C-alpha cells in the first residue's frame, strides 16, 4: 500500500503515462513536478490524496484544473502550482504582480476550500473568508486578440526617449570628467558626517 509517489522530472506530457495511478487508490502524496503536463491532465480518483505538487509544468487553464481536482481529490489539503502559467508569479512573468497572485490564491481557495497550504504558503483565516465572499469573482479572464485587431494595429516599439531624439540624424552624447579620485586606503563612507552627529 503505497502512500507516497514522486514522478518528478519524467518530462512526460503524455496522458497515458499517468493512467497507472489508478492502481494507487491509497496514495496520500503525489509529486508531479517538471513533467511538461498541460491542460489535458487527467488524474484518476484518489480519495486519500492530501498533497499534490504540479510545479513547473505547462498548465494554463486554472479553472478546468481546479474543477477536476475538486472531483478526483476530495481530501486535498496541500497544492502547489508554482512555475505554471496558471499560477501568476513575478518570477515567471514580468507582467504579473502581487495583486495577480492574491487574486489567484482567492480563486483557488474558492474552488478548493479544504486547502491548508497553497504554493508553500499556509492559508490564512482571512484568505479563507475572502475566498468565500469574493472568490467567484477572482477568475482572471483575458480577452482573446482577434486576427483583425492584430493586423490593423500598427506595430510600435516602446522607447523611453522623447520622439525628437529618435531621429537617425540627431544623435547627441554627453562627455563628463570625474573631478575627484580617491587614493586613500580607508573607506570614505562617512566623510559627510560631522563630529556633532556622532
Curated annotation (Swiss-Prot):
- InterPro entries attached to this UniProt entry: Leu-rich_rpt, LRMDA, LRR_dom_sf
Q: In which tissues has expression of this protein been reported?
A: In the embryo, expressed in melanoblasts. In the fetus, expressed in melanocytes. Not detected in retinal pigment epithelial cells.
> Which keywords accompany this UniProt record?
Albinism, Differentiation, Leucine-rich repeat, Repeat
Domain LRRCT stretches? 96-134
- LRR repeat ranges per the UniProt record: 2-22, 26-47, 48-69, 75-95
Gene Ontology process terms (BP): melanocyte differentiation
Q: What disease is this chain connected with?
A: Albinism, oculocutaneous, 7: A disorder of pigmentation characterized by reduced biosynthesis of melanin in the skin, hair and eyes. Patients show reduced or lacking pigmentation associated with classic albinism ocular abnormalities, including decreased visual acuity, macular hypoplasia, optic dysplasia, atypical choroidal vessels, and nystagmus.
Role, per record: Required for melanocyte differentiation.
- The protein here is known as Leucine-rich melanocyte differentiation-associated protein
Question: Which organism does this record belong to?
Answer: Homo sapiens (Human)
